[in-house]
From Swiss-Prot:
Species this chain originates from: Homo sapiens
Transmembrane segments: 26-46, 55-75, 100-120, 140-160, 198-217, 238-258, 272-292
Encoding gene per record: OR7A10
Family: Belongs to the G-protein coupled receptor 1 family.
Keyword Nucleotide-binding set for record: no
Pfam families documented for this protein: 7tm_4 (PF13853)
Disulfide bonds listed in the record: 97-189
Topological domain ranges for the Cytoplasmic compartment: 47-54, 121-139, 218-237, 293-309
Function: Odorant receptor.
Extracellular-side segments: 1-25, 76-99, 161-197, 259-271
Protein name in the entry: Olfactory receptor 7A10
Cellular localization per UniProt: Cell membrane
């Protein structure tokens, strides 16, 4: 990859969330703590699901996949940021930047698709309870996860490969704590119209499509819950999807907030600080949301730890 004047570009500078020297120690401790909580929390969900045979159901199969993706998602960005803060070095190589961008797109896409699959699972469980295990059979569950991976990989590879031919100018500073594709593309010296079109199309198709599916699923779920006569039955039905609805609201709400913030304030640290919500905070909170009021997960964790003693 070459710059506009044919000199080789080997690295970018990640400016991070803040350039204030007095904040670096605080940011390091904060993000290290959040990273460890995220990894351990999601790892516990995976181990509890695997170790308890009662949780070998479609709902918890998808949840364990989401937890695995969240671990990978946060591991794509935070460790590099921690290294940069600790070493006082903002450099990321060109190859490292493209790789980070590729994996970030992969895992954010997987989060998106898995949340949609989980919404469909809740739709079948509440609207077609008698046929739930027939419809959500192991083959379909595996195919849904596989399809999520395939679509995410294709999107990630397409957008990352389209960055490779772009020539870059001498201004190589990225006002972010990771190589966010929109920020990187707009550092290029050439016309990025095609890249922008592909990015907007991907957001509309791969973001809007799953969100539409989630909204449709929940519209049917709400209709089914309203048809239940007893208050206890309504509460029980709603409680089975309350955690998922909370995670969906958090994920899409923070994503929307980030892009609105980025649109309002170009080339500032505001967008980077806002993106912490869906890149770090959401994966960290997911295990707490799913386990806080879920007696099956809490019971599986207790059994798991008792078995280790």
């Amino acid at each position: 990859m070459k710059s506009w004047n044919n000199t080789i570009i080997l690295e970018f500078l990640l400016l991070g969330i803040s350039e204030e020297p007095e904040l670096q120690a605080f940011l390091f401790g904060l993000f290290l703590s959040m990273y460890l909580v995220t990894v351990l929390g999601n790892l516990l969900i995976i181990l509890a699901t695997i170790s308890d045979s009662h949780l070998h159901t479609p709902m918890y199969f998808f949840l364990s996949n989401l937890s695995f993706v969240d671990i990978c998602f946060v591991s794509t960005t935070v460790p590099k940021m921690l290294v940069n803060i600790q070493t006082h070095n903002k450099v990321i190589t060109y190859a490292g930047c493209i790789t980070q961008m590729c994996f970030f797109l992969l895992f954010v896409g997987l989060d998106n698709f898995l949340l949609t699959v989980m919404a469909y699972d809740r739709f079948v469980a509440i609207c077609h309870p008698l046929h739930y295990m027939v419809i959500m059979n192991p083959q379909l569950c595996g195919l849904l996860v596989l399809a999520s991976w395939i679509m995410s990989v294709l999107n990630s590879m397409l957008q990352s490969l389209m960055v490779l031919p772009l020539p870059f100018c001498t201004h190589m500073e990225i006002p972010h704590f990771f190589c966010e594709i929109n920020q990187v593309v707009h550092l290029a010296c050439s016309d990025t119209f095609l890249n922008d079109i592909v990015m907007y199309f991907a957001v509309a198709l791969l973001g809007g499509g799953p969100l539409t599916g989630i909204l449709y699923s929940y519209s049917k779920i709400v209709s089914s819950i309203r048809a239940i006569s007893s208050a206890q039955g309504k509460y029980k039905a709603f409680s089975t999807c309350a955690s998922h609805l909370s995670v969906v609201s958090l994920f899409y709400g923070t994503c929307l907030g980030v892009y609105l913030s980025s649109a309002a304030t170009h080339n500032s640290h505001t967008g980077a600080a806002a993106s912490v919500m869906y890149t770090v905070v959401t994966p960290m909170l997911n295990p707490f949301i799913y386990s806080l009021r879920n007696k099956h997960i809490k019971g599986a964790m207790k059994t798991f730890f008792r078995g280790k003693q």
